[in-house]
Amino acid sequence: MTTLDAVVYGADELVAGPATDGRRLETYEDGAVAIVDGTVAAVGPTTEVTAEYPPESANHAVDADGQAVIPGFVDPHTHALFAGDRSDEFAAKLRGKSYQDILAEGGGILRTVRAVRDADEETLLSNLLAHLDTMLAHGTTTVEVKSGYGLDTETELQMLRVIDSADAVHPVDVVPTFMGAHAVPEGWDTDDYTAAVVDEQVPAVESQGIAEFCDVFCEEGVFSVAQSRRVLEAGAAAGLTPKVHAEELAHIGGTQLAADVGAASADHLLHATGEDIDALVDAAVTPVLLPGTAFGLGAAYADATAFRDRGAPVAVATDFNPNCHSHSMGFALSLACVEMGLTPAEALIAGTKHAALALDRTDGLGTLREGAPGDAVVLAAPSHVHIPYQYGTNVVDAILKDGSVVSTPTHESYDREVQP
């Protein structure tokens, strides 16, 4: 027995996903989507979809007249599980302090590490659930969350447990990434800590069986290419797909490493070269660009057009973390357009379909095509262009996750848009 979960109909613009006919997007005017048993069953003109799937027979019927409907956002790079407050560091940066200055004074990542180690599991879960609520309210229906603020076996495992617990109770799908190699903890030599990650943390993470990916901060002054390779190869042997923070602050070869190890994604990439981009394309590694990070630091942005023009499937993420405190994929897409050179259509693809590729999702996630997960966002605007156009504004009006209309503490008006 199948269940007609939802029918969204009458949309001024319904975006099914990237087009295959020369257009950027496959769109429908007066469009509709039907979701059955959590999966998209039909998408197309309202007259055709509703003839087969009558809205009055659905658990949720959404009249989207005057509105646009898009796939739910996929945020493929966050550090959303943390404790403590580093807002004072934002003010310090405005006064001219560099991140390196702040780190030398005991701030930055290591300050968050101390706060996470001091927090109990209940507090960490509460923090993460609150962040997921806000992300959901801004249209994110799938998000990757990394560990990496523990930097010891016990706390890294605790973080992964919390991520798993959040995934079990929250509507947003939460994808877990182990990142013990996020920084070198206080009192450690980098080689010794790399060995601890490889010999102690990775086997413990494998035994726990929660993490899906293994990430490393391959950067000058953090983990070298050789050290990063050790971590990623150990993770791969434990069944964890590699990811790489690469070429953020300097060019040291992290992008080529990502290609060599067959990473799902290489992220940041501010200093990637044309040769690096070609290597990613050849190895089918998705580049993930993080405009919010540059915005928060007042730094240069990656050139998305360089990746696009070489055939790379550019993805965009928030990089939500204590040093980049934005939950909003919409804001990230605005920056990707204004500062990185993407069009609104390209930015939407970067935050949906291509973002799903960065998480190795090939089930249609990030689209509204037949067989894809039933994750859709109804905008309080008639076109997807309003996402980057209304920068700083949350244009999300209603969210469907697996075919169910989801409300959040910050969005309690959905009932006005939904007729059961």
Curated annotation (Swiss-Prot):
One Gene Ontology MF term: imidazolonepropionase activity
Obligatory cofactor(s): Zn(2+); Fe(3+)
CDD domains hit by this protein: Imidazolone-5PH (cd01296)
InterPro entries per UniProt: Amidohydro-rel, HutI, Metal-dep_hydrolase_composite, Metal_Hydrolase, MQNX/HUTI_composite_N
Enzymatic class: hydrolase
Example of a GO biological process term: L-histidine catabolic process to glutamate and formamide
Organism domain of life: Archaea
Pfam families per the UniProt record, alphabetical: Amidohydro_1, HUTI_composite_bact
Residue numbers binding N-formimidoyl-L-glutamate: Y149, N321
EC number of this enzyme: 3.5.2.7
Subcellular location: Cytoplasm
Reaction(s) catalysed by this chain's protein: 4-imidazolone-5-propanoate + H2O = N-formimidoyl-L-glutamate
Binding annotation for 4-imidazolone-5-propanoate: R86, Y149, H182, E248
Cellular component, GO annotation: cytoplasm
Function, as annotated: Catalyzes the hydrolytic cleavage of the carbon-nitrogen bond in imidazolone-5-propanoate to yield N-formimidoyl-L-glutamate. It is the third step in the universal histidine degradation pathway.
PANTHER family, per database record: IMIDAZOLONEPROPIONASE (PTHR42752), IMIDAZOLONEPROPIONASE-RELATED (PTHR42752:SF1)
HAMAP family per record: HutI (MF_00372)
NCBIfam families in the cross-refs: hutI (TIGR01224)
Family: Belongs to the metallo-dependent hydrolases superfamily. HutI family.
Protein name: Imidazolonepropionase
Source organism of this protein record: Haloarcula marismortui (strain ATCC 43049 / DSM 3752 / JCM 8966 / VKM B-1809) (Halobacterium marismortui)
Protein encoded by which gene: hutI
